[in-house]
Amino acid sequence: MWFLILFLALSLGQIDAAPPGQSRVVGGYNCETNSQPWQVAVIGTTFCGGVLIDPSWVITAAHCYSKNYRVLLGRNNLVKDEPFAQRRLVSQSFQHPDYIPVFMRNHTRQRAYDHNNDLMLLHLSKPADITGGVKVIDLPTEEPKVGSICLASGWGMTNPSEMKLSHDLQCVNIHLLSNEKCIETYKNIETDVTLCAGEMDGGKDTCTGDSGGPLICDGVLQGLTSGGATPCAKPKTPAIYAKLIKFTSWIKKVMKENP
């Protein structure tokens, strides 16, 4: 599981953290300004990414659960004043019912179970204003194709030796890999509800602070960052993402029942 404990209040003037797990963009680049308008920052007891799928709804990783959240939208840089920046509180959160939190796990289970059904919906206390820098992205309608070039994004650490978030939103281009590649690394992963993406040669990855952020393959939102190996970007150790096509019915049901 990849998540990041904040050492600061929401001033965001200085962002340092110590990760109990791992999830950041490594080997990436500064995203083009406003190119990822659905990307949000989710701040609770941990720092995570998230995705705006409706003006009132954000989807993120279940392991990013907190009692309270603040959501930053329209951000490219976490510390600068930006014209499209918005801030929202969260009125309700809904972890997937089949996600098993760490504190409830049977200790005989292997770590890969952390990543199964790892998604959560956040109901914003006030709908986001849709602008040039804040937009929703549609849920997938078809299975992603192995070999697709995918884009992951987030403000997670870019250097595993520095416990510090990136101020600028980072993007990284990686390949969607086969289930077999995932099973080689994570023996008990449930590949029907997860995706594996990365570079088998290493060097490019998501990592600490990126959990819950988007994985967009061939222009379609297909996954949410869940976790991976430590340190990030190791050869032959792709990262794990929640496979959203398997959860669209649950997502729509929760949104409909909680207008």
Curated annotation (Swiss-Prot):
One of its GO terms (biological process) is positive regulation of vasoconstriction. The keyword Hydrolase applies. Its EC number is 3.4.21.35. InterPro entries: Peptidase_S1_PA, Peptidase_S1_PA_chymotrypsin, Peptidase_S1A, Trypsin_dom, TRYPSIN_HIS, TRYPSIN_SER. Residues 1-18 form the signal peptide. Residues 25-256 form the Peptidase S1 domain. The active site is at H63, D118, S211. GO terms for molecular function: serine-type endopeptidase activity. It comes from the Eukaryota. GO terms for cellular component: extracellular space; secretory granule. It is an enzyme of class 3 (hydrolase). Pfam families: Trypsin. Belongs to the peptidase S1 family. Kallikrein subfamily. This is Submandibular glandular kallikrein-9. It comes from Rattus norvegicus (Rat). The gene is Klk9.
